[in-house]
């Protein structure tokens, strides 16, 4: 009887060790693989008549679509007593470095983006027509109508068009933002995402960044340049009074569209 009880106990313990780790609520509620880069936009809703009139919704800090994803908690395994100080759970490679390689690891992105665009177009079109006909003569005499009008004419037409257009745009952003790894792809690349909020007197400013990086591009000081981020999404904007003053009112936008 004791042997049967012992076998049953060992079977139950073995089954518990083979169970999948329990996912924490923050992992379950976090973003999925599909919206890992751009964020979950299914819950974007207007916060009232103010957002409706100004035609936009301000982002908020602590958005679940931009929340960090922490590593899953591994279940505890009870190892058999061998009398040795060696533990497989604390094994590390002697030649390994400390670069981010797993979900939840932190990396600093150096923002150094500069773009310049210019375009110009010139158009110069002209067209002229000149047509004439001498009077008709019959028997050496001009053919006239009612003794006053002959069949001669002289027509001249000229059209000219000149157009000149040019457009220039330049943008630059520099700084730092620390993000976290939210997914490790099958080829070893890392999907990163993070945000930073700055609370000012009359509003908030935020920086959001997401994209995919290679571990080989990470420098020894755990930083990577923003131009090394693939499929990068960089947002730098603000909320509050200063941001509202930079945009035209809804009446101005209405009349601009109507005209």
From Swiss-Prot:
One Gene Ontology term from the biological process aspect of the record: bacterial-type flagellum-dependent cell motility
Membrane topology: Lipid-anchor
Keywords: Bacterial flagellum, Cell outer membrane, Lipoprotein, Membrane, Palmitate, Signal
NCBIfam families to which the protein is assigned, alphabetical: PRK00249.1-2
Function: Assembles around the rod to form the L-ring and probably protects the motor/basal body from shearing forces during rotation.
Sections of the chain in a coiled coil: none
GO annotation, cellular component aspect: bacterial-type flagellum basal body, distal rod, L ring; cell outer membrane
Transmembrane feature ranges: none
Family: Belongs to the FlgH family.
Lipidation positions, renumbered (N-palmitoyl cysteine): 16
One Pfam family matching this protein: FlgH
InterPro entries per UniProt: Flag_Lring
Taxonomic lineage: Bacteria, Pseudomonadati, Pseudomonadota, Gammaproteobacteria, Vibrionales
Superkingdom, natural source: Bacteria
Signal peptide: 1-15
Protein name as catalogued: Flagellar L-ring protein
Lipidation (S-diacylglycerol cysteine): 16
Organism: Vibrio vulnificus (strain CMCP6)
Subunit details: The basal body constitutes a major portion of the flagellar organelle and consists of four rings (L,P,S, and M) mounted on a central rod.
Gene symbol of the encoding locus: flgH
Gene Ontology molecular-function annotations: cytoskeletal motor activity
């Amino acid at each position: 009887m004791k042997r049967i009880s012992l076998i049953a106990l060992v079977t139950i313990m073995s089954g518990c060790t083979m169970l999948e780790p329990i996912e924490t609520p923050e992992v379950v509620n976090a973003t999925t693989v599909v919206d890992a880069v751009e964020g979950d936009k299914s819950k974007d809703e207007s916060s009232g008549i103010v957002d409706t009139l100004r035609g936009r919704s301000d982002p908020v800090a602590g958005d679940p679509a931009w929340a960090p994803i922490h590593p899953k908690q591994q279940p505890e395994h009870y190892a058999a007593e061998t009398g040795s100080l060696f533990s497989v759970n604390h094994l590390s490679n002697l030649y390994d470095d400390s670069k981010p390689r797993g979900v939840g690891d932190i990396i600093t992105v150096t923002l150094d983006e500069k773009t310049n665009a210019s375009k110009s177009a010139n158009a110069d079109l002209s067209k002229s027509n000149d047509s004439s006909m001498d009077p008709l003569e019959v028997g050496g005499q001009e053919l006239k109508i009612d003794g006053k009008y002959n069949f001669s004419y002289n027509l001249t037409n000229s059209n000219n068009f000149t157009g000149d257009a040019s457009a220039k745009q330049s943008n630059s952003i520099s700084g730092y933002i620390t993000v976290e790894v939210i997914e490790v792809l099958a080829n070893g690349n890392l999907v990163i995402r993070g945000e930073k909020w700055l609370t000012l007197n009359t509003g908030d400013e935020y920086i959001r960044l997401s994209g995919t990086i290679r571990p080989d591009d990470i420098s020894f000081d755990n930083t990577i340049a923003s131009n090394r981020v693939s499929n990068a999404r960089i947002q730098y904007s603000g909320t509050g009074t200063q941001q509202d003053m930079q945009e035209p009112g809804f009446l101005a936008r209405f009349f601009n569209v109507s005209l």
